[in-house]
Structure formats: structure tokens, C-alpha cells
Amino acid sequence: MDHVTQYPVIVDTHRHPMGPRMQAKMAERGLYDPKQGFPQTNAQDLICYRECFDLDYAMPKQREGGVTLSLITNGGEVDWIARDLLQVSTGEALKFLNDEYREISDRYPGEFALTANAHALEEGCRPIVEEMIKGGAKAIAVASSYGDGADRAFLDSPKAEWLWEFAEANDIVVHIHPPMQSIGHESLMQYRLNEAVGRPFDSTVNGARMIASGVFDRHPKLQVLIVHMGGGLASIVGRLEFNWRLNYNGIKNPPADKPYTNKRSPFDYFKTNILVDSMGFSAIGVRAAIELCGVDRVVFGSDFGPVPYGIKEQVQSVEEVLPSVADREWVFWKTSNRIFRLGLSDTGFISAPALPVAA
């Protein structure tokens, strides 16, 4: 179905634009050759598309897709950017990223909103996060996990408590994106499975651990946004439910740190604490996300740039699932406007001649 319906506002909560300084660093590290055309790749299987590297080329496509405002996030890559790309401290990397994104925002006024990128397990970055929030950042962006192998740590780590305390106290949403190298990546480097399967799996494991460890019971007002439709959480939340109910009941001296500590059904937290985005090229996935979280807890996300197409297709996925224009507006902008305090006005709905939308 050709996309013919226009909306006055669509907020894309999942964008990773790249500015000239980041491009220069990638070229310096041999990850990108500015003399070659696009697409191109490298030994790390990082595929570079023009839509990610050339904003003057990408922005008309963003507008044609109907997006009017995008959140800039890169919390999933902070660790990699600091350690491998820039080879500097986390604090220096955050300042680099934040300066880069301010330049992008200034270059395209009114089309980007900033987030405060952070390392969830390093409380030392808190002053930078506080400064960004005071400067207008709309959320805190972090990775779903850090490290690798047996040393990989998720956001149920005690080291993340500073983040939850700060976010809850300041009513700031935490945007959670998987890292470049996901859990199990060593078995997923064929067929781009690290990207297709590994990263959503990383989000799934992290979301399950946050629920089971009682993060949302300790911080009942905390709001987190898990990208890629929440990974596979909609498919496995029932399994979390029965394992939570069984737990280690009847087991004498249960092993330390293994029993569930959450006080409510795992399903409940999707109605009160967890939001997800619509990125995934699947109406089935959008429908599952809405059934799990509610229509007012799913926000639009495209991942456009690193994924060099698909804004229109992902708008259509929402349209296919939600025949009601009023319901679509929750996904396209109203929920984002509320949770990120974007200050957008309700300008109504503009309709061009449209084909019927499947129920």
C-alpha cells in the first residue's frame, strides 16, 4: 500500500544521525573510507550507508516519510565510542557526542531533539548528564548491557542504581538501546544476525532482568523505553510469569541471587514502567507491543540512517494495526510529546485521499 495519509506531527524516537567529527574519527580508525562510495563495510562488519553519513541526503527522506521531529540517541554505543573509536574516557566521549549532536540540532533547527547519552554503570558521568538535562535534553540514553562474555553486565547491576534514582527523581525517561556487540554475538556474525537477532535479544534479557531484580519495585515511578518493540519481551513475558509464580518455592536454601524479587506480575510493569517503540518492520510486532503495553505506551521509532530505508513502511505498520486515527496519534506523537515534554501542540489531522487501512 502506498503511503498517502499525511500527519501534522510524527515524532521518531529512534534516530542515530552522524556528524562530520564522528565521520572523521571513523575514517581515522579505518572503519570508513570517505573516498569510496556507499554502502561499504569493514573487518568489524559495520555496514556504512549514505543515509547515516550524509545528512543533507538523508533529511529529505526523513521528511518524505512524514517525520517532523527526531530524538537523537546513541546511548547504546557510548562504551564502544569511548573505548574503541575515540580511545578516551567515558566523560570525554560524552562531551564529544553531546557537542556533535548540538551541532546537528543547530544545523537542522526544529527537526531534532537531544537526549543525554550516558554510561549506565558509571556514576562518574552523572554531572554531564545533569548538565545536558538542564540544557534541554529530553531523555537519558543508555545501553542494555556492557562488557562481554562472563563479564557482561546488564541494568539490574547495583552500579546502575544511581541512574534509576536520578531518572525517577527528575521524571526523566531512560531510553535503552542494545550495544553494537550483543550478548551471544560470537555465534551471530553470519547473515547479519547480530543486528537482526542479537540486539533485540540483548534488550529482552535486560528487560527480564530489570523486572526480576525488582528495579521497578524499588523505583515505582521510573519510566524506561526499550527499543526494537522491546526485543522479544512480548513473546516471553508469559514465561517470566510462570517462572515468577513458581520461583524457588518449596526449595530449602534457594541459591543466592537467583530467585525473582519482583512484587507484581511481570505483565504489570509494561502498563506502568516500560514503554517500547515500533521499530521492527512488522505489523505483527506492533500489534503485540500494543496489546502488551497499551496504545498509549508504544511510540514511533524508525532507526533510519543505520537502516537506510523504511520510515514509510513503519508508518504503514502502525496504520495497519490501528484503523483509528486517534489511536495512531498516540503512537506517532502524543505519548512522545507527554513523556519527553516536547511542547508540541495538537494541530489536528490532515488527510489526503487515502486508501483503506486494513483492520
Would you name each region that the model predicts?
Residues 1-13, 19-69, 99-106, 130, ...:
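Mid-to-C-terminal alpha-helical segments outside catalytic/metal-binding sites
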Residues 21-26, 83-85, 128, 186-189, ...:
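Short aromatic-enriched loop/helix-cap "lid" or pocket-rim segments at secondary-structure transitions
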Residues 45, 49, 58-62, 66-93, ...:
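Short, well-structured secondary-structure segments
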Residues 47-53, 119-125, 148-158, 277-283, ...:
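Acidic-and-aromatic substrate-binding clefts and catalytic sites of carbohydrate-active enzymes
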Residues 75-76, 120, 178-183, 304-306:
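Short glycine-enriched loops at secondary-structure junctions
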Residues 93-111, 161-176:
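Alpha-helix-loop-beta-strand connector modules within alpha/beta enzyme cores
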Residues 124-137:
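Extended, non-globular alpha-helical segments
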Residues 137-299, 350-359:
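Catalytic pocket-lining loop regions of alpha/beta-barrel enzymes
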